[in-house]
């Protein structure tokens, strides 16, 4: 432990050395900023890959009739798009933000367990190399949807399913190690005076998210291992012929899957809770209630999983319980939304790019929440289930929710990361193009879904043609706009107006007390928090 509690003068010369030179700096790095950067670049590459798969889906659905891909390949695209976006884009992006920002926010010299931190990143290229390689195997890649329901993913799966299972194992191990690292850091490395109730909300949401990850990732590992056993080792967990039950798969999967969707949104809640007070130039309204609301959401996320299964045939008592439990999540979520709105109320608002994304987050995430309340109503869900209405719902919480939260965070902290201000005009252009493209892409899906257009089908009835064309145009617009974001980031790294230590007027917190760009080693001597 001596390295953690060293006196500041010990190895005085070592405290200001920069990174090693060359490629091995990145392979072997234990520096939280390097690892955060690796996560962020990796997640953006996966975002572009998963996004290009979505472009294939939308190109096929531009017109009715089978146009450009075979139905079998279409199913591989929907499956891989979901898996890559969830496990490859959204989650690693938030882990990257956690690695970069949590030590700076709590005054820690680095993350706890830095070598495990490095390993948890390097598992990801292996996992996704394995996953993407399945597309080139005989019989093709996973074609059973990102939820990989048995028996489609077991009895009737392509041969490549085994590689998919190992990819999920690797991604899960990575997530667990990242979460352990976050918890160890937050609980052990806070600066003197930084009590739990003084932590920035981003740190709080990540602490709770990390506990969620540790709780549910083993469940995911368990369910894919049961699949592996059914496929190769003669068990019958999910096969009725051998005394098993395909519905068991759904229960185990969604017991992981529902907390998982909260894992993807809670860090965004934390980031937005840092950004809105900054640009409203007043403290966050209801800090304590925000902490308790986050914890309530996390707790409730474990008791709602069967709302994904209303049409499977579960006892009506069960449907009632899961319906009411699901609706209950709207309460702490509503607390959060009203706190954000109240924070903006009578503030001295300015709308720089991070604030634009944060305000869009609040508005559009709320729309996604309302359609979620509709889906929670068990009798109504018989109409909505497996239609594009569900696709509209979860893309309204994932795109303006998770993705806009990531964009807002990136613009907010880019000056701290690079030492330069990004191009504000281009940032605003990126926002408006993303905002318009996203709404064009996903709003019409509510209509075609309510009219009965089923999900995951490469062809559709003529009556849905117009809205699908609008959706596809919006999707292409949203997709191409992300190349502009890449340009903005590279331009910001290469140069631009030098960023001060605190580039935003209303910003609070330890991360703004260090120079921009953040030095390679920070808080070697812990700061005092009053």
Predicted segments — roles?
Residues 2-530:
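Membrane-embedded and interfacial regions of multi-pass energy-transducing membrane proteins
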């Amino acid at each position: 432990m001596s390295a953690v509690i060293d006196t500041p003068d010990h190895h005085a010369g070592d405290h200001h050395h920069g990174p090693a030179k060359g490629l091995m700096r990145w392979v072997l790095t234990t520096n939280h900023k390097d690892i955060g950067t690796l996560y962020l670049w990796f997640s953006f590459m996966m975002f572009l890959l998963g996004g290009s798969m979505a472009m294939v889906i939308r190109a096929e659905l531009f017109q009715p009739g089978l146009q450009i891909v075979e139905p079998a390949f279409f199913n591989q695209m929907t499956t891989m798009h979901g898996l890559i976006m969830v496990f490859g884009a959204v989650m690693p992006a938030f882990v990257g933000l956690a690695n970069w920002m949590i030590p700076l926010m709590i005054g820690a010299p680095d993350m706890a367990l830095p070598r495990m931190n490095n390993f948890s990143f390097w598992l990801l290229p292996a996992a996704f190399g394995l996953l993407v390689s399945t597309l080139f195997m005989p019989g093709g890649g996973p074609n059973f949807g990102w939820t990989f329901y048995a028996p489609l993913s077991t009895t009737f799966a392509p041969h490549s399913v085994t590689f998919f299972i190992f990819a999920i194992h690797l991604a899960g191990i990575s997530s667990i190690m990242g979460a352990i690292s976050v918890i160890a850091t937050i609980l052990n490395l806070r600066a003197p005076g930084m009590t739990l109730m003084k932590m920035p909300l981003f740190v709080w949401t990540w602490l709770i998210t990390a506990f969620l990850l540790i709780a549910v990732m083993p469940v995911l590992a368990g369910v894919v291992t049961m699949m592996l056993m059914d496929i190769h080792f003669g068990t019958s967990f999910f096969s009725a012929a051998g005394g098993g039950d395909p519905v068991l798969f759904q229960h185990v999967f969604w017991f992981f899957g529902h907390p998982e969707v909260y894992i993807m949104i809670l860090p965004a809640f934390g980031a937005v809770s840092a950004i809105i007070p900054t640009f409203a130039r007043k403290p966050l309204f209801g800090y304590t209630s925000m902490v308790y609301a986050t914890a309530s959401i996390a707790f409730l996320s474990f008791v709602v999983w069967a709302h994904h299964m209303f049409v499977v045939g579960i006892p009506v008592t069960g449907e009632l319980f899961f319906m009411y439990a699901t609706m209950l999540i709207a309460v702490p979520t509503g607390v959060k939304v009203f706190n954000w709105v109240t924070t903006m109320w009578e503030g001295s608002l300015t709308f720089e790019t991070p604030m634009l994304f944060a305000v869009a987050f609040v508005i559009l995430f709320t729309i996604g929440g309302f359609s979620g309340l509709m889906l929670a109503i068990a009798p109504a869900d018989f109409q909505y289930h497996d239609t594009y209405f569900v696709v509209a719902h979860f893309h309204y919480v994932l795109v303006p929710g998770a993705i806009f939260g990531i964009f807002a965070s990136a613009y907010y902290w880019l000056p701290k990361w690079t030492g330069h201000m990004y191009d504000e005009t281009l940032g605003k252009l990126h926002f408006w193009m993303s905002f318009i493209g996203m709404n064009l892409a996903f709003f019409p899906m509510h209509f075609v879904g309510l009219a009965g257009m089923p999900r995951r089908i490469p062809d559709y009835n003529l009556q849905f043609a117009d809205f699908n064309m609008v959706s596809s145009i919006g999707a292409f617009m949203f997709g191409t706009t992300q190349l502009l974001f890449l340009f903005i980031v590279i331009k910001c790294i290469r140069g631009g107006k030098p960023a001060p230590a605190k580039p935003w007027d209303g910003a609070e917190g330890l991360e703004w007390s260090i120079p921009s760009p953040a030095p390679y080693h920070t808080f070697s001597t812990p700061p005092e928090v009053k």
